[in-house]
Amino acid sequence: MFTTPIIAPVSADLIRQELTPDKLLRATNKGGNEIYVFHASTAPETMREIGRLREEAFRFYGGGTGRDCDVDEFDLADDGYRQLIVWDPAEGAILGGYRFMFGDEVQIDEATGRPRLATAELFEFSPRFLTDYLPVTIELGRSFVSLPYQSTRMGAKSLFALDNLWDGLGALTVLNPAMKYFYGKVTMYEDYDPHARNLILYFLDKHFPDPDHLVRPTDPLPIVVDEVEIRELFPTDDRLENYRALNKAVREIGLNIPPLVNAYMALSPEMRVFGTAINEDFGHVEETGILIAIDEIIPDKRVRHIETFDPDKAQSDLLWTNISRRVRLVKS
């Protein structure tokens, strides 16, 4: 779909020079990898490599920006997003990453009254969300796993890539205990079978609703289903039973439920889903908004990704400079 060539890989030596100890967040629980956090201004070459890997991964599935490198104003602004990456020190490669922003740092655009978030063009936020939720929410975006680590040829490294990323997200909640929620999106691509997509979206809307109407898509993607089929497919209100039926139905179409959809559902049974918008500027991908309460993450995930983190070993100056102030405020 896109013809602009993606930039060449950035030298691993340049990235190593930028991934200094002050950016190290933690070691991963599995795979022998490391997690770093930084702003683009402090690691510009690493930011270029992130942009290359993001564009490569998103284009592979039919999304992407169409530019030679997926880096935008939200990455580069002085008050913009921070990057969280998993680094494989043995291979000298980035496995994957997120960009994130703490909600109490989000600026409100005076002209529009909207928060300066990457999702603000796709979703409308209720006054209650802006007042009661956003200040205690970590907004997540641009989740990716590098293409080489999506294949089994990388062995255990591939298996643990997403798990490693959640080690990083878990550490953020320990370092900034004022944060109570994760807000972000799951993506399905334009070429994903519409029938399978609608079954998945119906299931999410049924079992992970937003009764308070906190967030809604600016231009919602309609969920078109056959009522007779739905009654037969989901005859009860039992979430696990209906999930098994959904998984079977999607497999019969020849597909799998997207991994991130499965992964987020497994994090918390109380997840909220906010509907789906089409991102016209990103290859017409379908973006579904979600909210997960940190204290509702299931116990085994909390133990694995949150309780294993020792904040006394965190070295990231960028985090400590900003978070220690908040911790003092919470305690006072």
Which residues make up each language-model segment?
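Short amphipathic alpha-helix that is part of the acyltransferase structural core
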Residues: 27-72, 83-102
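C-terminal non-catalytic accessory extensions
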Residues: 287-332
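A short helix-loop-beta-strand connector motif used in the catalytic cores of GNAT acetyltransferases and
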Residues: 74-85, 108, 271-272, 282-288, ...
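Short, flexible loop/turn elements at secondary-structure junctions
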Residues: 39-42, 88-90, 99-104, 142-144, ...
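Short acidic (Asp/Glu) patches
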Residues: 63-71, 77-81, 101, 111-128
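Conserved N-terminal entry element of GNAT/NAT acetyltransferase domains
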Residues: 2-41
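Acyl-donor binding region in acyl/amide transferases
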Residues: 105-271
